[in-house]
């Protein structure tokens, strides 16, 4: 939580210059401290529905040990669901109508599976636009993850994602470009982020649309950017919410697709994820799978537990820090009535007072 500058100590001014959140006493006195209500628009397919819930709930819950968070999951009825996932949604999720009536302080929008290159033809397209447009006028800040970033960049900023020559898949080093922005204050200036995508929006596209790039990788491209006002829309291209084993699960799925004939090539390793010994084990497993298929036998199971024990997580702490900063900033400027966007005196075009709107 931020420090209140209750006197003229020069350290307060110095910390402000470094990007630290320092509150003026008058501002602090008018804050209405209460619980925060965060919406989670979960558009992930059935197999990843509950895992995605856990990943984002975990990040939110770990971001601050003092504040109280109510997370409200919902989805779009236009997304096709199987019986089990549909029952889960009907029992535990709220409707968008209920979300809209009650209001939110913040909104997170997940990625989704797509059936073709044109996002505008996907069943979620129009209802997603409705949610995002409502959130822009009624929610303090919206965080878009991966494909949601690409969709919002297309319909709100006119920037279409571009197909990559090969899937950007693995764990990549990143650096903070805007060190004084409050979203990345006091996090590591260099850190890792997982990526898993076939498409990209470039640095030039973000900047050309008036957005601000905060975190980037030479190998993986832009990870974190914000809307022209500096805060009301936050964009991830990577997956900082991923569990340690998330990429392993994806690799296992792709091996299964190869074994079932759904893909013609054996999947490559995610970049910078498996160690030397693990790669040796998986190379041996690949030979066994191919040999079994050639002989008409059932392929051996991937030794998932053995592999998982050797994996390292090099991104979660920084992800927790960024989400913690995001939640803290929302706490400072959101209205005490969650059906309204900002507390009195906040400029919607520059809510953090960064003069970047």
Curated annotation (Swiss-Prot):
Recorded catalytic activity of this chain's protein: L-homoserine + succinyl-CoA = O-succinyl-L-homoserine + CoA
Top EC class, one word: transferase
Biological pathway: Amino-acid biosynthesis; L-methionine biosynthesis via de novo pathway; O-succinyl-L-homoserine from L-homoserine: step 1/1
UniProt GO molecular function: homoserine O-acetyltransferase activity; homoserine O-succinyltransferase activity
Subcellular location: Cytoplasm
The keyword tRNA processing is assigned to this record: no
Alphabetical list of InterPro entries matching this protein: Class_I_gatase-like, MetA_family
Keywords: Acyltransferase, Amino-acid biosynthesis, Cytoplasm, Methionine biosynthesis, Transferase
Domain of life: Bacteria
Record bears the keyword Membrane: no
The EC number(s) this enzyme carries: 2.3.1.46
GO cellular component: cytoplasm
Membrane spanning stretches: none
Site label Important for substrate specificity, positions: 196
One example of a Gene Ontology biological process annotation: methionine biosynthetic process
Catalytic residues of the enzyme: 146, 239, 241
Annotated site residue numbers, Important for acyl-CoA specificity: 113, 147
Residues that hold substrate according to the record: 167, 196, 253
Family in the record: Belongs to the MetA family.
Biological role stated in the UniProt entry: Transfers a succinyl group from succinyl-CoA to L-homoserine, forming succinyl-L-homoserine.
Protein's recorded name: Homoserine O-succinyltransferase
Highest classification ranks of the organism: Bacteria, Pseudomonadati, Pseudomonadota, Gammaproteobacteria, Chromatiales
